[in-house]
């Protein structure tokens, strides 16, 4: 049996370097307000993105290379590009929280994706015992109501106010409430 450790890969996967995805599956990339796609950022609301993630995991498990796969050891990373998410596609618009503020507008979009991914991974590859590592950051940091991740998800939250600000009681309380959700 192959032993794979749990390890982290940030801002993964980067599908912008796969021309066949950029041209053949543009819907997996974030849609700008003008309708063009931004290949450096994934669209986490479109079903094709989940399908492509799972295709990559299937390739990695089968030993067919790591094409499209955000797999590192026993870990599958969901860590969007280092920008705020702002996808204007119909799928993301349905999940967007207009009242989410600076830390929660895109939270439901990415959290729903992570939830679906983790459940599919657990169902399809139970023997692999993969951990889906989710790194909430920027405008998808606030935990959305109504999503309870399965046990194969590890959340590594980035506290957006910055560590030094935690000395302020209001910030500390707000961040603690988010952690407890």
Question: What are the language-model segments listed below?
Answer:
Residues 1-51, 55-181:
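Catalytic-core regions of glycoside hydrolase
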């Amino acid at each position: 049996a192959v032993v794979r450790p749990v390890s982290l890969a940030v801002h993964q996967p980067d599908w912008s370097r796969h021309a066949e995805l950029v041209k053949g599956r543009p819907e997996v990339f974030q849609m700008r307000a003008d309708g063009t796609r931004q290949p450096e950022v994934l669209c986490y609301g479109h079903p094709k993105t989940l399908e492509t993630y799972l295709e990559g995991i299937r390739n990695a498990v089968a030993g067919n290379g790591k094409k499209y796969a955000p797999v590192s050891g026993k870990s599958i990373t969901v860590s969007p590009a280092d920008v705020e998410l702002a996808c204007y596609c119909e799928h993301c618009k349905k999940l967007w929280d207009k009242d989410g503020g600076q830390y929660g507008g895109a939270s439901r979009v990415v959290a729903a994706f992570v939830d679906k991914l983790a459940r599919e991974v657990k169902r399809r590859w139970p023997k692999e015992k993969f951990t889906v590592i989710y790194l909430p950051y920027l405008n998808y940091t606030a935990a959305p109501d109504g999503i309870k991740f399965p046990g194969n998800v590890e959340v590594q939250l980035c506290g957006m106010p910055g560590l030094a600000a935690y000395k302020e009681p209001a910030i500390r309380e707000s961040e603690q409430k988010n952690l407890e959700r």
